[in-house]
């Protein structure tokens, strides 16, 4: 059966030891998820503190911090996506790292919360920094939240794909059948995640795992919510700027 053969050939083809992973170049690959979160929070805090002398709404200050946090997280992610090889992702997925789940939940909740904050800010009429400046901050927040959402799910799909198969720990779960690609890298998973984010469907990649299918369902629903809010915010901004 194609699915079974695919799973075994892909899983065994990427099997590698912890030593091989640790010897791979790049300290960033070995940096725990929680440390990336802490560093990004530190960047956001420093920038927000540096802007304390400037008079602005507290929520505007928080939004600037959120933009810095999001950009920092995406820089980490971009560097990892472009440099990490499939066999490294496989070993990473085998590690018991509860911090990854915690970071995923925290950042996902913060991303959703940022949209609520942006909607509240758009009702503000004080514009202490000027209408155009604050509008730019809010739009940047929406864009950062959108990219960060799909970046989070890129990580999730990759770790689910390369996690141990429950019936055979020597192979990985797979769960996604990517045409002509047995050993996908992070950019393949980014393609899958961002296509769902933009179209609410999975295009040419077939889902064969119940767990990934459920994650994709949640991802699609959140993407629909985000895109609906983005359209509403865009209309609000255009009307507000014309008034």
Regions found by a protein language model. Name each.
Residues 30-51:
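The first (N-terminal) embedded transmembrane alpha-helix
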Residues 78-96, 119-127, 159:
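Membrane-helix interface/capping segments
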Residues 144-166:
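Transmembrane alpha-helix/helix-exit interface in multi-pass inner-membrane proteins
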Residues 2, 6-30:
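Short, Lys/Arg-rich, polar N-terminal cytosolic tail immediately upstream
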Residues 89-109:
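Juxtamembrane helix-capping/reentrant segments at transmembrane boundaries
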Residues 161-163, 167-206:
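Membrane-proximal soluble regions of multi-pass membrane proteins
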Residues 57-75:
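Loop-to-helix transition at the N-terminal end of transmembrane alpha-helices
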Residues 188-195, 203-243:
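Pore domain of cation channels
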């Amino acid at each position: 059966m194609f699915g079974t053969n695919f799973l075994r050939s892909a899983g065994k083809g990427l099997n590698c030891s912890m030593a091989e992973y640790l010897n791979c170049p790049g300290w960033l690959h070995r940096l725990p998820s929680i440390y990336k979160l802490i560093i990004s929070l530190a960047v956001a805090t420093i920038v927000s503190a540096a802007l304390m002398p400037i008079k602005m709404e507290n929520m505007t200050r928080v939004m600037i911090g959120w933009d810095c946090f999001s950009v920092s997280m995406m820089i980490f992610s971009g560097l990892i996506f472009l440099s990490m090889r499939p066999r490294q992702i496989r070993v990473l997925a085998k590690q018991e790292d509860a911090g990854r789940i915690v970071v995923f939940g925290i950042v996902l909740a913060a991303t959703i919360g940022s949209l609520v904050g942006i909607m509240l800010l758009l009702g503000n009429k004080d514009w202490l920094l000027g209408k155009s400046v604050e509008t730019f901050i809010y739009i940047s927040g929406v864009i950062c939240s959108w990219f960060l959402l799909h970046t989070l799910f890129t990580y999730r799909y990759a770790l689910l794909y390369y996690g141990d198969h429950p019936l055979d720990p020597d192979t990985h779960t797979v769960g996604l059948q990517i045409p002509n690609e047995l050993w996908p890298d992070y950019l393949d998973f980014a393609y899958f995640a961002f296509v769902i984010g933009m179209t609410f469907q999975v295009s040419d990649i077939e889902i064969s795992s119940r767990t990934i299918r459920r994650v994709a369902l949640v991802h699609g629903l959140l993407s629909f919510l985000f895109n609906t809010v983005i359209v509403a915010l865009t209309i609000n901004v255009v009307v507000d700027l014309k008034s």
